[in-house]
């Protein structure tokens, strides 16, 4: 097994542990919403439910039944638009009351620590230092605080990806990577 695969497995395990530490058994249950207790997260769940239960509309992401009189779009809520659209595509296979918010926790923990590792390794070329340094990013109190209050704003890994683009990408590719990163961040929270 290559070092890259081992690192991905280690960060996956750490991300799963951190997600489980916060969510408990709900981490494994994509239909359990008992842990969703902040006003913002309830609003995100309600927006996802309205969007998921509605027909497909153009432009993609329209959510006219959510909101008072004027409707809304999934990109303007904290429902992680890219996930809402992807999971709506397969909603006929999903159980009732399905949500992807616990998956988002895992992704944030994984990418936060993995991208931090990549940055630190690029700067130090030392796997041990990079791993130990990335643990501080994994348990970042600011990110964890955002996760449990307003999930989409916990995508601090997007900022880290921006740093990584700047320090590691050839000049000719930077614009392309920035366009991809900004597009992705817009699909997470507008």
Segment roles from a protein language model:
Residues 96, 125-126:
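Short, well-ordered coil loops that connect the C-terminus of an alpha-helix to the N-terminus
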